[in-house]
Amino acid sequence: MMPSTPRTSIPSITLNDENTMPLLGLGVAELSEDETERAVLAALEIGCRLIDTAAAYGNEAAVSRAIAASGIPRAQLFVTTKLATPDQGFTKSQDACNASLDRLGMDYVDLYLIHWPAPPVGQYVDAWGGMIQSRGEGHARSIGVCNFTEEHLSAIIDLTFVTPAVNQIELHPLLNQDEMRKSNAQHNVITQSYTPLVLGRLMDNSTLTAIAAEYGKTPAQVLLRWNLQLGNAVVFRSAKAEHIASNFDVFDFELAVNHMDAMNELHDGTRLRPDPETYAGS
């Protein structure tokens, strides 16, 4: 059972459907079932309430077990899962949502996302239509997308008249997604960043380490703080309890404008995850 008073208070943001979502959460991509259970329990213990999983991760059941072990009431949690590309389609997406709910042991998810637009598959608009149905039936409180470009985002909005609540995209100092953030904002869509820690590639960067030293923070904390100060929601992945606790401890300082600018100058367009224009996996 978790302590009654969590150690970290995480702010929330209001989505375009009036639901609220924590600004910072734990992702469990590429974690084994055992790693997932331990990571989720560690995160919940220190005050995290947003857990981000996906059908493609193969660990929804592990998330369910960790949540059950925590003793935290379902209503206090924000659980995200994602539609796998092979399940895209109007009816298939609804069936996939129900299958995810079965694995999660839940009646609803707080946020259901299309994992990838997968343009070569040509089903993301139909999949979005199915997700609208799932929301209408109460199986998903909010619905959104991942890895959508402006073209993909405009297509589903124009064809269904329903705007995603969230667009979760790869976003870090090497790929600051300035144009996509502006596009999301124009559509009143929250930008949620993933891979914010750059897979560890900037931890020895002299700009980052100098800024971290100035604030008495870790490079990871500075990376997360930079992302939050851009106005993004963020999910990060970690399997280590001490890193999870440290990474949620980012709400007691603010980066100065010159430090934000220095971080912004690291942008070079490096993409660490697949190109959403061509990728047909996950």
UniProtKB/Swiss-Prot annotation:
Binding sites annotated in the UniProt record for NADPH: L197, V235, R237, S238, A239, S246, N247, R273
Entry's transmembrane regions: none
Keywords, ordered alphabetically: NADP, Oxidoreductase
CDD domains linked: AKR_AKR5H1
GO terms, molecular function: aldo-keto reductase (NADPH) activity
Pfam families given in the database record: Aldo_ket_red
The keyword NADP is assigned to this record: yes
UniProt cross-references to SUPFAM superfamilies, sorted A to Z: NAD(P)-linked oxidoreductase (SSF51430)
Active-site residue numbers: Y57
EC number of this enzyme: 1.1.1.-
Family note: Belongs to the aldo/keto reductase family.
Protein name: Aldo-keto reductase ML1669
Organism: Mycobacterium leprae (strain TN)
